[in-house]
Amino acid sequence: RHIAFVDRVGDTFRWKGENVATTEVERAFAKVPGVAEAAVYGVPVPRADGRAGMAAIVPAAGQRVDVRAAAAVLARELPAYAVPRFLRLVGSYETTATFKVRKVALKQQGFDPGAVSDPLYVLVDRARGYEKLTPRLYARICAGELRLP
């Protein structure tokens, strides 16, 4: 007999051969000014290895999240592979009876600006930080013309 540790589905994802713990990334968002909550999950990216990190962020009441400043904080707090490639600004989350964020719908919606009405941002260049995810950028990412760092 033996005992094996089995991780909860959704608590980790793989990006470019590395395991990313969503809780570690969510804790890093606590240091980003203007962020009340963050739910982190992996989303498939065409022609990429694994799932890219995406964070659905609830801004603190009456505050704006500076997405460029967020990139700098996350780069300081996390290994490069763990920094989410996509951000989604949301008003609130759908939760379970035990107050856990329902990430399934967020994962299914992915990062398509044509399907998601919330503001979306992408990390194309670490030095510049996050920028607005436009339909043109989305098409270039999906076609493999634009590779995420």
PLM features per residue range, with description:
Residues L78-K100, D118-L148:
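AMP-binding/adenylate-forming catalytic domain of the ANL superfamily
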